[in-house]
């Protein structure tokens, strides 16, 4: 597949499991908006591909007891406040929307996120 041919890796190439500050505007409906952290969930070969897209989950500091969310506590992922990963809000964004790398989540947290995505998508 042409879109999976890799580009040269640069310091700004996101890696699966990293949290980045991203600009998600403009949005529609109930999509998360504004500048906010996002968790990269796409595989690294895709992240380095000519597609110039990355698959992310928005992160919010508005904590709600919703079963498909995953709670992260600082300093995990470079976050400063307790936050929820919105597994129900998976989306592809242009890598141009990524502003700053904040950090990486622990393998255990990523495993929980992966389980929630599997349930949501019926995989």
Mark where each language-model region is:
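Conserved functional hotspots at enzyme active or ligand-binding sites that engage polyanionic ligands
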Residues: 1-123
């Amino acid at each position: 597949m042409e879109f999976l041919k890799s580009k040269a890796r640069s310091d700004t190439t996101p890696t699966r499991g990293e949290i980045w500050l991203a600009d998600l505007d403009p949005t529609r409906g109930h999509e998360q908006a504004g500048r906010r952290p996002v968790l990269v969930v796409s595989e690294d070969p895709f992240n380095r591909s000519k597609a110039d897209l990355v698959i992310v989950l928005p992160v919010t500091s508005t904590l709600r007891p919703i079963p498909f969310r995953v709670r992260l506590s600082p300093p995990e992922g470079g976050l400063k406040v307790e936050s929820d990963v919105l597994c129900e809000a998976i989306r592809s964004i242009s890598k141009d929307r990524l502003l700053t790398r904040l950090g990486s989540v622990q393998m255990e947290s990523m495993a929980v996120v992966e389980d929630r995505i599997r349930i949501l998508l019926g995989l």
